[in-house]
Amino acid sequence: MKKIILFGLLPVLLISCDRFGSGRVKNLIDLTPKLEVQSKEKLKFNASQIKKNPFSDQKSKSYSLAKNTIIAKPAFAKGVMYSTDSKGFVSAYSLKEKKILWQTDIAKGVLDRNFNDGGVLYSNGKLYVTNSSRYLVVLDAKSGDEIIRKEYPDIVRNKPVMATDRLLLAQTVSNQLIAYDIKTSKFVWLHEGELETISTRSHVHPVVYDGNVIVSYSSGEIVYLDAQSGKEKWRYNLTKISDIGIPSFDPSVIVTVPIISGEYAYFATSNGKIIKMDLDNGAPAWIKVADDIQSLSLVGDYLLVTNNARQVAALSSHNGKALWVGNLIAQKDRSKRKVRTALFQEPFVAQDGNSFSINVIASNGDLYQFKPDASGFIPSEPTIISITKNVKYHWISCCNGKMHLITGRNIVY
């Protein structure tokens, strides 16, 4: 009898499940708290702050860069793009000749090739490459020949940076910042953060400014050091007691490369904050609560930010207030049952006739443009232009102002 009853209820259960699943499913976009305008203003930019429109009328073409996925933002120097990929190869690509000049295997002898983080630094005719191994590999930029490799105490997942003409800084996953003399091939000093949080989260590389370096550790610390000596000037902890709940493998770290202007550093953190930090004393000038920030740029008096809620916003660099918020999604897509997430590049401001436009490149193949209306205010709805899909990085040439879009394996320009 029980079997008969259950068999009779089965259609009802299936109908109920169908009704339950037919509504719009919440995803990361819905769950991310949205930014709201706090003080509506007309945004104003000087001519020097507005780029020439990098998307020329000439049709772009796609060129192959690598057989494997590019894992870090490429370096550009003297008309050549240098990149490192997921299988341990470093490539040089000529932008003028539109071809690969050389390719070098820096993971010789490694059987399990699955690199996913790293960076390429060009300095004085040499490349300094990391790829989530323990090695810093130095290559001749012209030929691709290996000059030397240096083994570090732990894995290096971030891009190395030059502190001086001979001092290179690299950060390990175990919260060590190590200074390496490229002339003598010796380690000069080491600075360590507190006990690290085990995490797969990648955070930004150290940033050098005026003889000092700002570094973010997975312990939640931000430290400002003398780049020459490694002597600590100040430290600030991103994790406050009020932030601590259930132990997590998601550390509080800086997630956007710090932008330094006028003795202040601007950056977003993984625990939902945008901070303007006074570099003189390590004290925040202001803190703005803003969750899941993807990218950030500073243009004039405004911080332009994007987030996982598919928004772009202009914040006052003076007090952090939101002056304008735009939508990075078409109106027709908002009512869809499953709205896809997207990755957004750093916003930039470009010339648009006699005016300007705020531009955001998205991984879904769309360029979102926001232009002031007749009243001088910028609307929240964008003009959407189809470009290249799966863009991971972009680079605007300082020589001709042209846009270069880089996907996992190709470059479009």
How would you name each of these model-derived features?
Residues M1-I4:
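Positively charged n-region of N-terminal signal peptides that target proteins for export
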Residues F7-L13:
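Bacterial N-terminal signal peptides
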Residues S94-K98, D140-G144, D181-S185, D226-G230, ...:
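Short loop/turn segments that connect beta-strands within beta-propeller blades
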